[in-house]
Amino acid sequence: MNNSWWQELMRFFLQGMTLKQLIHMLIILIVLIIVMPVSVKEWINLHNPEILPHYWMYYILLFCVSYVLNGVVNSVYHAVTERIEASTAQRRKDREEKVVRDLFDSLTLGERAYLAFAVAANNQLKTEKGSPEAISLLKKGIITRLPSAIGYPDIDRFIIPEKYFNECYMRFAGKSDILMNELIVQDEQLKK
C-alpha cells in the first residue's frame, strides 16, 4: 500500500512548525486524550467510518484540535511578547528621556551659557584651560574633550556628543546672548 498521501498530509500539518511548537502540540494532544470523557470517545467511535480502525476518528479529531489550539497559543504568545517588548522599549525610552531632562534641568547658568555658545559655534566649544564650567560639563558627560590645537596649549576644545546635541540645540539655540546677559547680571550680584 502506498503511504505517500499520509506523508503529504503530515507535511501539510507540520510545515513551518518548529520543534518547540511540535512538542507543545504533542503535550496538548496528550492532555486532551487524558481529559476527554469516555462518553465523547464512544460517541465519536459510533460515527467512525468502517474504513478506519476503531477510535481512529477520535484520535484524528484530537490531533486536529491540538493543532488548532497550538496555533492559537502560539499566536497569543507572539502577540503578548511583541506587546511586552514594545512596552519595555517605550519605558526604556521614557526613562532615558527623563534622565536627560533631569540632567539638563540641573545645569547651572554658566554651564547653560557654555552649551549655548557651543550650539551657536556649530558644536565647537573653546575655553581657557581648567574652566570650572567646562570641567563640570565634562564630568557630567555632556561634552567631550578634543585634543588641544597645535599652537594653542592654553585652550581646551570640546564638542557635544550626538547623544545630547539635539537636546542642547532645542534648549539653547539662539539663547547665547540672553544667557550671557543673565550670567553678567549674576556675576554683578555676587560682587555686591
Curated annotation (Swiss-Prot):
Pfam families: SieB (PF14163)
Localization annotation: Host membrane
Signal peptide location: none
Keywords recorded for this protein, A-Z: Host membrane, Membrane, Transmembrane, Transmembrane helix
Annotated TM spans: 22-42, 51-71
GO cellular component, one term: host cell membrane
The UniProt record lists the keyword Repeat: no
Top-level taxon in the UniProt lineage: Viruses
Keyword Membrane (UniProt): yes
Membrane topology: Multi-pass membrane protein
Function: Has a role in the prevention of superinfection by phages that are insensitive to repression.
Protein name: Superinfection exclusion protein B
Originating organism: Salmonella phage P22 (Bacteriophage P22)
Species lineage: Viruses, Duplodnaviria, Heunggongvirae, Uroviricota, Caudoviricetes
